[in-house]
Every structure is written in C-alpha cells, then in structure tokens.
From Swiss-Prot:
Keyword Transcription attached: no
Molecular-function annotations in GO: proton-transporting ATP synthase activity, rotational mechanism; proton-transporting ATPase activity, rotational mechanism
Compartment list: Cell inner membrane
Protein encoded by which gene: atpF
Protein name (database record): ATP synthase subunit b
Main location: membrane
GO cellular component annotations of the record: plasma membrane; proton-transporting ATP synthase complex
Organism: Helicobacter hepaticus (strain ATCC 51449 / 3B1)
Ranges that cross the membrane: 4-24
Protein's job: F(1)F(0) ATP synthase produces ATP from ADP in the presence of a proton or sodium gradient. F-type ATPases consist of two structural domains, F(1) containing the extramembraneous catalytic core and F(0) containing the membrane proton channel, linked together by a central stalk and a peripheral stalk. During catalysis, ATP synthesis in the catalytic domain of F(1) is coupled via a rotary mechanism of the central stalk subunits to proton translocation.
Signal peptide: none
Keywords linked to the UniProt accession: ATP synthesis, Cell inner membrane, Cell membrane, CF(0), Hydrogen ion transport, Ion transport, Membrane, Transmembrane, Transmembrane helix, Transport
Membrane topology: Single-pass membrane protein
Length: 171
C-alpha cells in the first residue's frame, strides 16, 4: 500500500505543481488511468514469467552456492584425510627409522661377537702354530746335533748315552 501511495505522489504531485493550466483542461487523469491499466495488464500477464525468471535465477544461484559449499566440504575432508595420511606416514617413517637403528645395532653386536670369536680363534691358531714351529725347530736342532755327533769320530758315546739322548729327544 505504501508503494502505491508513494508512486501516486511521485507521479501526480509534480504534475499538479508545475502545470500551467487547470486540471480540467488536461487529459492527465485519463493518462494516469491508462498507465495504471497498462501496469495492471502487464502485471497480470508478465508477473508469472518475471517471477519465474527471478525464482529460476534464485534457484540457480542457490544450486551454485550449494555446489560450492559441497566442494568446500569435500576439499576440507580431503585435506583432513591428507593430513591424517601425512601423520600416519610420519609415524611409519619414525617406526622404520627406529627399526633400522635397532637392526643396525643388532647386526653390529652380532658382527662384533663374530669378530671377537674369529680373533680368539686366530690367536689360538697362531699360538698353536708358534708352539708347533718351536717344537719343530727344537727337534730339527736335536736331529742335526745327533747326526753330527753320530757322524763325528771325535766324540765317543756309549749306548747308555745314546739311550739317554733319544729319550730326552722323544720327550
């Protein structure tokens, strides 16, 4: 109602103030009535289509807004999923690094133990070899000395001396 009154005031008031002749000599009222009839006919025939256009536009905008909001929610869910996967990957990486460190420590211990055993074995073998070589050199020296004594005519030994030397050599 306020809109209609405002419209009548806006259209009619300037015409009344600025008119130079009386209202009876003009066709203003007929023109206003024709304009009102024109607006009413236009309203009657075009209102539904104009309203439909605006409703369709509003629905299209609403649909686009809904689609954008769905895309936004989808992006947020994907971001959260990616964050979770990133955290899981970091945790797996930490676990892998810890497992690798532990495995390296165990391998180091294993190889250190094996190296110690190998060193002990080599040490024992070396000591045995040294002892064997010492005995071998001693036996060779005794054999050489006995051969010289037996072959030389300077030294005269009796059988008891030979038996004594041989028993010492054997032991």
């Amino acid at each position: 109602m306020k809109k209609i009154a405002f419209f009548v005031i806006c259209v009619g008031f300037p015409s009344l103030i600025f008119a130079s002749a009386s209202i009876q000599e003009s066709d203003f009222i007929q023109r206003v009535i024709n304009f009102v009839i024109f607006v009413a006919i236009l309203w009657y025939f075009a209102f539904d289509s104009i309203k439909g256009i605006f409703v369709n536009r509003r629905n299209a905008i609403s649909a686009r807004l809904q689609e954008v909001q769905e895309n936004l929610h989808k992006a947020k869910r994907e971001k959260e999923t990616a964050q979770k996967r990133l955290e899981e990957s970091k945790e797996k990486a930490k676990n892998i690094v810890n497992a690798a460190k532990q495995e390296a420590y165990l391998l180091e211990q294993k190889y250190n133990d094996q190296i110690k055993k190998d060193i002990e074995t080599l040490k024992y073998a070396l000591e045995s070899n040294i002892e064997f070589e010492r005995r071998k050199i001693t036996h060779e020296a005794v054999d050489e000395l006995l051969n010289k004594l037996i072959q030389s005519d300077d030294v005269q030994l009796n059988k008891e001396d030979y038996v004594n030397i041989i028993t010492k050599r054997i032991s």
